[in-house]
Amino acid sequence: MTQPVALLDANVFPTTWLLDILITLDEHEIVDVVWSERQHRDPERIDRFLDSIRSMNPTHCIYGWEPRETLLDELPDPDDRHVLAAALVADADYIVTYNLKDFPLEKLSRYSITAIHPDVFLCRMLDRDTRGVLDVMDTVVSNKNNPPRTMGEELAHLRKLRLNTFSDRLKSLYSE
């Protein structure tokens, strides 16, 4: 089964709890997570974290998107053209973003790329590979030591990140 490719918008990076899940999904080969170097420059507070994950797999950072950016004028915000350009170069299936309004469906449909809220994206991955996502969540929780966290605490925090459906579905699966 081919992994979907998901380009992460810059607004996903500051949320390290979400990013931890997405990177671990990638490590478990459930999804191929990518980003562009330009996105690294957006929120300064993520630099240390990005430095640690850059070495993980150099193919996660997409290069060579710059020439395409100038050809893309479909998006409402010109500052988001680089995101679409990088997604095209990566042959991404998804742009994972909290700002869906910046990536209108009618503008992306010609490229076969879907802008998707992180909650919906995680639910799709859960549908695609339930056991794999549960393993990822177990790994994420067991790796959190400072402070240690229970699955219940993790799920409660995911709700604060507007990952309500994903959190509810996980809670249901863990109660079975």
Question: Model-derived features: where do they sit?
Answer:
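Metal-dependent nucleic-acid phosphoesterase active-site entry motif
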Residues: 1-20
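Short active-site oxyanion
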Residues: 4, 30-32, 91-94
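PIN/NYN-family metal-dependent endoribonuclease catalytic core
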Residues: 16-44
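PIN-domain endoribonuclease scaffold, especially VapC-family toxins
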Residues: 34, 38-66, 140-162
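Acidic, metal-binding active-site segment of PIN/NYN-like and related structure-specific nucleases
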Residues: 83-113
